[in-house]
Amino acid sequence: MKKYLLSLLLSPAFFSNLTAQNNTPWNNKKAAVVLTYDDAVNQHLDNAIPVLDSLGLKATFYITGYSSSIRDRMNEWKKLAANGHELGNHTLYHPCVGGVGREWVQPDYDMSKYTLRRMVDETRMNNVFLQALDGKTKRTFAFTCGDMKIGDSSFIGLLKNDFVAARAVRAEMHTIDKVDLYNVDCFYVNGQTAAQMMEWVKKAVETKSLLVILFHGVGGGNSLNVLVPEHRRFLQYLKQNEKDCWIAPMIEVAEYVKKYQSH
């Protein structure tokens, strides 16, 4: 038996399979790319979804429950979820920590005035709302403004049973063994060209890493914006490079990472 195991471990087939796993750790691809869209604005429905669906690409849309687009176009958001896109949780009212440089934060939704209980309760309420939209009980979360604490206390620890993963905003990439599922890094888009975003993808493939991209406005809807032609050109590039890139919603990639890291 020992001789058999030794011969198996030394066999070319074993090393070939091991090499293949090391070279294609992301669902048999070199890299994973997750497209995320924050705040549920009309331009996601008007400008992002048509391109994504025409190319057969699936993304994650981080939904703030109070969004006027959700209120006015709810059936379209339901259709989006039914078509394979993830509706992620981006809180009920999009609270952020106010202060210098963030004068736009409304006093009622200033996270510096929140309690841990209020943050957790509002976030869980948004989960209930999203479940009513898509029927799903598993989803991921995105920190608003990248703010992760109420005072000095992190709140995500209280929500780990509610979410498979949580996306933050630090611009870094990590290999599958180094991904922190409750502090997933991402690159946010603010005026970048398709060519600039393509460089992110090339780096992810070279380093066999997870690349998460954060869009806000797509042809408008937010001051953090990408032009429609650049967005379309970038998605077309992704589609052309599916042989190297696994492109999937955050929930699918997070569950894959969780399974990998548990072994």
Put a short name on every predicted segment.
Residues 38-39, 51-55:
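Conserved beta-strand->loop/alpha-helix structural units within folded catalytic cores of enzymes
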Residues 45, 49, 74-78, 120-130, ...:
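Generic structural signal for well-ordered alpha-helices
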Residues 32, 53-151, 161-162, 169-184, ...:
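Metal-dependent polysaccharide deacetylase catalytic core of the NodB/CE4 family, i.e.
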Residues 21-45, 187-188:
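Boundary/entry segment of secreted carbohydrate-active catalytic domains
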Residues 1-25:
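Bacterial Sec-dependent N-terminal signal peptides
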Residues 37-40, 91, 217, 250:
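Active-site metal-binding loops of divalent metal-dependent hydrolases
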Residues 39-43, 71, 113-121, 191, ...:
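Soluble non-cytosolic domains of exported or imported proteins
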Residues 23-25, 59, 68-69, 131, ...:
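C-terminal domain-boundary segment and adjacent tail
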